[in-house]
């Protein structure tokens, strides 16, 4: 601006969208299990359709292969229609671990012998799937060495609060994989 005052600004913006065009791995039985046609590092998970409400609900649902289930456990959709919920029912979901958009902006100010520069940056359209101890504050077992977050303890499915749409599934006494699967829940 003048000999004593200097101001400058800067910014950046990048956009990146990718898709796997070729993969020499053998094709999967179901097209949605293949990497070709999807972005690199595409997250895959099970589609949650709520929580089991009763033993009758469990008996009338496809078999889940991630351990025995009880009322209050996450209920998953049978994508391939074979009556069994397993790794073949995982579908692409969400953004990948590679951001589509990166951005930044900054400003520099100098007045006499005083200098100040600030830069801000960010990324968006990026995803991460979390589960297990990242959600519950422990491995989900009430016998583990960790503690549950208060949020989980107060908003989970219980026999006294049998809400099939509870924010969190039931808690369990020991290692249990069904409720820790990567999913839309």
Which residues are covered by each model-predicted region?
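Transmembrane beta-strands of outer-membrane beta-barrel proteins
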Residues: 7-11, 105, 111, 116-118
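Transmembrane beta-strands of outer-membrane beta-barrel pores
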Residues: 13-19, 111-113, 122-126
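Generic recognition of flexible, low-complexity loop/linker segments
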Residues: 92-93, 103-106
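Short, intrinsically disordered, charge-balanced linker/junction segments flanking boundaries
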Residues: 175-185
């Amino acid at each position: 601006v003048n000999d004593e005052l200097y101001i400058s600004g800067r910014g950046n913006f990048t956009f990146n969208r990718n898709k796997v065009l070729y993969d020499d791995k053998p094709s999967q039985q179901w097209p949605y299990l293949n990497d070709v046609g999807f972005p690199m590092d595409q997250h895959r998970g099970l589609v949650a359709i709520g929580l089991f409400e009763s033993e009758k609900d469990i008996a009338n649902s496809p078999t889940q292969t991630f351990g025995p289930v009880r009322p209050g456990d996450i209920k998953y959709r049978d994508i391939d229609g074979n009556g069994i919920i397993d790794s073949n029912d995982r579908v692409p979901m969400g953004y990948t671990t590679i951001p589509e958009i990166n951005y930044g902006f900054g400003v520099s100010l100098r007045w006499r012998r005083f200098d100040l520069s600030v830069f801000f940056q960010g990324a968006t359209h990026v995803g991460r799937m979390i589960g297990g101890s990242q959600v519950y504050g422990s491995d989900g077992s009430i016998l583990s060495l960790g503690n549950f977050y208060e949020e989980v303890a107060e908003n989970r499915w219980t026999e006294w609060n049998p809400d099939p749409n509870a924010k969190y599934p039931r808690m369990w006494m020991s290692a249990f994989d069904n409720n820790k699967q990567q999913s839309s829940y």
